[in-house]
Amino acid sequence: MIAAVEKDAVPRKRRVISQVSQACIRCRQKKIKCSGEKPSCQACSNNKVECIWPDRPNMRGKKPSSAARTLSPLTGIVQPYLGSHPFSPTILSPSSPNMDFTYSINSFGDYQKQLRLPTSRKLLQLWDIFLKTSYTELFGIFNKAQITSQIASDTAPPVLVLCICAHAARFSQEEVNRFKSSTAASDYYANQAFSLLPCRFQDISLTNITCLLLLCLIELGSCRGAKAWLLLGMALRMVDSLDLGNEINDNPLTMGSNTVSWTEAEQKRRVYWACFFVERLLSTGYMAPSKLRSLSLSLQKTSIQLPCPEPNFLFNQPILTELFDGSLPENTQSDTTSMAPYQRSLQLEFMTGSLIRLSNLWSEISRWALCGGYTKDITPPWLNQSQFHRSFELLKAWHENLPPRAVWSYTNYSAYSSPGESAGACYTFMHLLYHTTLTYLLRNVLDLFPEKSRQKSKLFSSVSQRFGQQPPTVWMDMILDQVITSADFITKLSKDPLNYIMSPFVGFSILTAATIHMLLKFCVVNIDQNYISSSRLVHVDHQILQDRSKYWKINQAMLVTLQRLYNFYRFQYLEEQSLYNFKIPGFPLCILEYGIVEDQSMKSNPDLNSFSKELFSRGTNELLNNGDDTQSGNSTPAMGVSEIRTDTILDEEVPVDPLITSILDDGRWWEEMFGSERKAGFKETVFEDMNGRSIRL
């Protein structure tokens, strides 16, 4: 047997794969071999693509002790910066736009942004404009003395300064001249504020909530309702996180060392009630988010006081105020007898609390009207058991319980509107909201498009058909007198030269009043000649809304609605044969909803019929007298106008742009507002209102 011979163990050669120390980004993504040639590897050269190389990492690194020595001096610098956010002026580059200063903001991490803001003197001017024109919905949220000193010393939070500038620049003539339009001036600062918000969302603070509310109002006025609701929802989520709906201290009047100061607690209350007011003000509309009202905004869960008077907040004078339901906090009821007379006398002498309570009434009434109003009630509205009567009594009770300084009088109005008094905006807006709510409620029982008749009861025909009986005459007269008085008040107050409020809600109030004035002009003036003066106010409504549409896009949409409704009233009630036949009177959504209008001005309707296209192609002079109320130069009715209704025609008419608001310009706008029912042959005759005459007040 042959023995096997053992061979020496020969080590196997190791297979060596040639690798490069670093591969380009494209080869690394495609997982292919990279030749490592620079500036372009072989694979990228063959594919004729750009070869991108990552930065070469530092292989050695630094010692831990060295890193600790480097970061230790910076610890004291980063901590205070997160709270104060100071901004300091730097050198303006020659290529930058013509602005006054450039501010460098070092935010979290390595994120850096360059912000260009005006000088402190210019910021103080914009701050003053903001207090006069835009300090309405958020009245009381700012400590004016603190914000003024921060702006003067360049220590104000930059994002808050940008939000204030975004509101004030819209009404500053200097900023409008610089940016060519009020919208561009506002968007310039608003966009910079939006760019700073993402890096601040991890910091839930009162400043961030305030900025979100300010930007929400800007988006609402710009006809971007969905974005406004998104910003408001984020602010309410921060309110829930901070639990602002509950008192921090056991006793709201104490200022112990273990609790926050009274001024800080009052500031948190004011931020909470500002969120409450904005949410209640914008809660009307079918598209309003139903689940946005968070738990902290529920009145059953709220246990904080209403805001105190403005002087107490500015001068840090603690005072006890009521809760929303009118009661005092439970932990202070036993101490009310020992309170100072000054504190007891001023418990009800505040205006912000009355405005907050009114906003809740507006929210409930608008939601009730949008859900059907009296048509969903089984009790006639003139009976005490009806929801309409209960809402009406709540409004009357609110008005009767106003403190003496908040009651409407020309003396109070002049005192609040004096220079340097910022409470005038709150005082004016409160009474404007009250009469808007009252008009909104009483209008629900009226027929805005009644049948042609000289009987006043025809204005309540829907109520009569709904409950099978005619309303009492006294009740109908009371409703008409109240709604006309409130509508006239809205128009006259909006036109008053002492009123500087530029809130977009004023435009909605004007539109609400204009619906009553158009009803008077075309349907009621023949019934009662006492309403002639009120019917003429529709031209004032048109002028006011036209002026405010220059600043807010949402008011532009309301102006178009007013013009279209005015055209319809003329064509419906001045013709022998009506253009449209109504079976069930109703309300168009455009006069009921506030806060959800989207910008559709740039959208065109591709379904324009050939008749409308032919009409647009014709010159304006060819249609000046076609379908006008009266022939120029005499008092005889124009063709197609009924002689019976000529006594309702005034010498001046609202000028209407036919390319925008003609009843024939868009075949779909009527379906969107009223429904699809119309007469078949209404387009056979051209009806245009293009007289072009100006408004004479």
Swiss-Prot record:
GO MF annotation, one: zinc ion binding
DNA-binding region: 24-51
Principal subcellular localisation of the protein: nucleus
Assigned GO CC terms: nuclear membrane; nucleus
Keywords assigned: DNA-binding, Membrane, Metal-binding, Nucleus, Transcription, Transcription regulation, Transmembrane, Transmembrane helix, Zinc
GO biological process: DNA-templated transcription; regulation of transcription by RNA polymerase II
Transmembrane segments: 500-520
Membrane topology: Single-pass membrane protein
SUPFAM superfamilies to which the protein is assigned, alphabetical: Zn2/Cys6 DNA-binding domain (SSF57701)
Protein name: Uncharacterized transcriptional regulatory protein PB1A11.04c
Organism: Schizosaccharomyces pombe (strain 972 / ATCC 24843) (Fission yeast)
